Amino acid sequence: MDKVWWHTAWGLLCLLQLSLAQQQIDLNITCRYAGVFHVEKNGRYSISRTEAADLCEAFNTTLPTMAQMELALRKGFETCRYGFIEGHVVIPRIHPNAICAANNTGVYILLASNTSHYDTYCFNASAPLEEDCTSVTDLPNSFDGPVTITIVNRDGTRYSKKGEYRTHQEDIDASNIIDEDVSSGSTIEKSTPEGYILHTDLPTSQPTGDRDDAFFIGSTLATIATTPWVSAHTKQNQERTQWNPIHSNPEVLLQTTTRMTDIDRNSTSAHGENWTQEPQPPFNNHEYQDEEETPHATSTTWADPNSTTEEAATQKEKWFENEWQGKNPPTPSEDSHVTEGTTASAHNNHPSQRMTTQSQEDVSWTDFFDPISHPMGQGHQTESKGHSSGNQDSGVTTTSGPARRPQIPEWLIILASLLALALILAVCIAVNSRRRCGQKKKLVINSGNGTVEDRKPSELNGEASKSQEMVHLVNKEPTETPDQFMTADETRNLQSVDMKIGV
């Protein structure tokens, strides 16, 4: 019986922990630099665009602007986490790192959809201009709610309170759903109104650290910035050309995105566009350090009837796997989070390259991008393959993103846990009742003196004639009728009269 109650208590404890997990939020915050600080929720990318605004509002702050982020960067603020600001998703970087912002420095802008989940940055206008690491002890603008919100400061101090800060029901319902949207960039090309996207394969001229594998990222310059070009590339009469340099190492590729402004949009939209895709088998590289896989490579070709030069946009997305064979992409982390992004105030130095400075007003301009890793599993490879479409109006190559898989609702998980616990309790009660009902008891009638404990075992376990008696209780009902009772009474009366006469 004790074991049954122990299992019951253990099941209730597990159920309680499951319920509490749905009602706990940990907010890790950093020091403030010119009022800007970083907020991470539950140790992973789990904040939506709408929740980011609500969270900053709960801290009595706002989402920072790009100018405020650049000022914080100059004050020494840098992270390795993507976070929301006003209108963008960025990473502030001071020192180059191969796994942070594609080895770029400055405020690295990510071209990401608003449906993805990241961290967030907030701006406190009343904070000091320099670094401020005082502990945050309250969420002043939160309202009543059942959620336990814990603020974890940089020095490890923790402050908890009951409440809620989210104002959108979809953010509350999706609080425990891991974001599987890979629209953060590497395999999904966002349509850009500036012009066409021309992909060119180049050999890696300078491996970065131990990450000398092939990576892909598409970037654009948000402001006037220096843009490195490979010296082997030649441009004649500003015509769109296709060139394929020789790969010094077939396993080391670099994806370069070239954007060119279409001078004559009317002539382009007037003519048809032919799109072809040629799937190529993936290859493996066992030197890769992370848990990433190889998606299929696709080749897209566009032909213009009025142009003497054929444009070929070849997109080779090389993913490498070591031993990880899962079908779901890992959660974006500080070490591996890749997306098609934009570089603002970014600076990189590469040998054998010439630097060219151009602005957005130029007729044609090309960006050279550094590699960055992006985790993606095989489950998304088949979705992203062969779903490319041409937009004749804007002349932009767009690729549809992978659809999200349906998530199991939280209430269904809780209901299943309750049913399982009730079933376990019912089985335990049934087993215990069966044991009790099946027990046999012995009736011992002691015919001697003294209690049962005082008698010898031999007397109790001896013959039935000496130690036990069978007791039969017989309920005998009277069989005589009332008439018979009357006859007997009259007979007794007559006998009594005769005796009196005789006397």
Curated annotation (Swiss-Prot):
Biological-process GO terms, alphabetical: blood vessel maturation; branching involved in prostate gland morphogenesis; branching involved in ureteric bud morphogenesis; cartilage development; cell adhesion; cell migration; cellular response to fibroblast growth factor stimulus; cytokine-mediated signaling pathway
GO molecular function annotation: cargo receptor activity; epidermal growth factor receptor binding; hyaluronic acid binding; phosphoprotein binding; protein kinase binding; transmembrane signaling receptor activity; type II transforming growth factor beta receptor binding
Keyword Disulfide bond: yes
UniProt cross-references to Pfam families, sorted A to Z: Xlink
Database matches in InterPro entries: C-type_lectin-like/link_sf, CD44_antigen, CD44_antigen-like, CTDL_fold, Link_dom
SMART domains given in the database record: LINK
Residue numbers spanned by region Required for interaction with EZR, MSN and RDX and for co-localization to microvilli: 434-452
SUPFAM superfamilies on file: C-type lectin-like
Entry's transmembrane regions: 411-431
Occurrences of domain Link (ranges): 35-124
Residues noted as binding hyaluronan in the record, renumbered to the chain: R44, R81, Y82, Y108
Compositional bias (Polar residues): 232-247, 264-278, 296-312, 339-363, 387-401
Modified positions (Phosphoserine) in chain numbering: S433, S447, S458, S467
Disulfide bonds: C31-C133, C56-C122, C80-C100
Post-translational modification: N-glycosylated. O-glycosylated; contains chondroitin sulfate glycans which can be more or less sulfated.
Segments for region (Stem): 228-410
Domain comment quoted from the record: The lectin-like LINK domain is responsible for hyaluronan binding.
Subunit comment: Interacts with PKN2. Interacts with TIAM1 and TIAM2. Interacts with HA, as well as other glycosaminoglycans, collagen, laminin, and fibronectin via its N-terminal segment. Interacts with UNC119. Interacts with PDPN (via extracellular domain); this interaction is required for PDPN-mediated directional migration and regulation of lamellipodia extension/stabilization during cell spreading and migration. Interacts with RDX, EZR and MSN. Interacts with EGFR. Interacts with CD74; this complex is essential for the MIF-induced signaling cascade that results in B cell survival.
Listed name of the protein: CD44 antigen
Gene: Cd44
